[in-house]
Amino acid sequence: MKLHEYQARDLLARYGIPVTGGGVAVTPAEAHAIAEQIGGPVVVKAQVHVGGRGKAGGVKLAQTPAEAEQVAGQILGMNIKGLTVEKVLVAEAISYERELYLSAILDRGSKRITMIASAEGGVEIEEVAKTNPSAIVKIAAHPTMGLLDFQARELAFRIGLRDGKQARQFAQIAGALYRAFVESDASLAEINPLVIKNDGNLLALDSKVLLDESGLFRHPDLAALRDPSAEPEAERRAREADITFIKLDGNIGCMVNGAGLAMATMDVIKLSGGEPANFLDIGGGAGKEKVKAALQIILSDPNVKAVLFNIFGGITRVDEVARGILAALEEVPTDVPMVARLVGTNEEVGRALLAGSKLIPAATLAEGAQKAVAAARGELVS
């Protein structure tokens, strides 16, 4: 689950991490009041769950409360990558000397929580990894004792913080960020940039926190922060239908049962020269209604040029999947070509149900992926 910037800022502040002053506004008048309370220049920032807000005009500097009200009026209601801005963060504008980067992630390679730091903050860490990988420092926390003090100090030293006061502050912030990550069941806790202000003190200027959906039952206070209006419509519908769904940038929709099989399906699509439009796992034992909801979600993406069904029926019955596909197509007629690889429990019944449809059959995953790629290119018709 994604937190808005203002929610992430408030969460980190609970752990003693210094953050900017300010507040969230849903009207221009509220933005005016917050800026007036701050009493100096402010930054008005759109609160939406997408990147590139600044380039889209969703981040603006305001020198006065009146200007803050004006720019808030421009940003509120703005459409950024398909999401409507309903809230803005009005934060004090900070003068600073240097930008740093700091984050906590779960490194699945080492199977440990890893702290990442860089002297090059303010830009995407992925870009730094490409252009100057030596500027990135990684230290894995101890699996039972957590991030140790000497590790936090080592992070500070290795990114070039030689001033004792700044190094101590950085180490304290790193320790606090680690605790926030662990105690919130986060999958990412990031401060970018972590700035050194003109007075020499450190401050978290922007932050990002992603929470593990599977851990939210332990954190009702954090679960209550979910903003359905800020989620893409497809992701909201998938969550309500108990479907695991992640939108991607390709044009081949995928419906699969099982996360491992779904990842393998995406891999084979790419190996066949295509690009998956989504990760979608209907789970074990999915019935007709869930399958119907899943297909409707896939078809709601205008980029989808073909759909691949890869169902291995164990707990999930192939005939139930077939009924769900037919039910969805009755409600949402489409010309999008569809390829079906259906094997397992009741597969003969499922195939018989789909025999009169326009679905393109495939005996293997490789064949299904190749046919889906060809269909997306307009080279194969049902």
Curated annotation (Swiss-Prot):
Cofactors named for this entry: Mg(2+)
InterPro entries the record matches: ATP-grasp, ATP-grasp_succ-CoA_synth-type, ATP_grasp_subdomain_1, Succ-CoA_synthase_bsu_CS, SUCC_ACL_C, Succ_CoA_ligase-like_bsu, Succinyl-CoA_synth-like
Gene3D superfamilies: ATP-grasp fold, A domain, ATP-grasp fold, B domain, Succinyl-CoA synthetase domains
Protein name per its UniProtKB record: Succinate--CoA ligase [ADP-forming] subunit beta
Described purpose of this protein according to its UniProt entry: Succinyl-CoA synthetase functions in the citric acid cycle (TCA), coupling the hydrolysis of succinyl-CoA to the synthesis of either ATP or GTP and thus represents the only step of substrate-level phosphorylation in the TCA. The beta subunit provides nucleotide specificity of the enzyme and binds the substrate succinate, while the binding sites for coenzyme A and phosphate are found in the alpha subunit.
Family, per entry: Belongs to the succinate/malate CoA ligase beta subunit family.
Keywords: ATP-binding, Ligase, Magnesium, Metal-binding, Nucleotide-binding, Tricarboxylic acid cycle
Pathway per the UniProt entry: Carbohydrate metabolism; tricarboxylic acid cycle; succinate from succinyl-CoA (ligase route): step 1/1
Cofactor note as given: Binds 1 Mg(2+) ion per subunit.
Origin superkingdom: Bacteria
Residue sites binding substrate per the record: N257, G314, I315, T316
Enzyme type, top EC level: ligase
HAMAP family: Succ_CoA_beta
Gene: sucC
Source organism of the structure: Chloroflexus aggregans (strain MD-66 / DSM 9485)
Residues noted as binding ATP in the record, renumbered to the chain: K45, G52, R53, G54, I94, E99
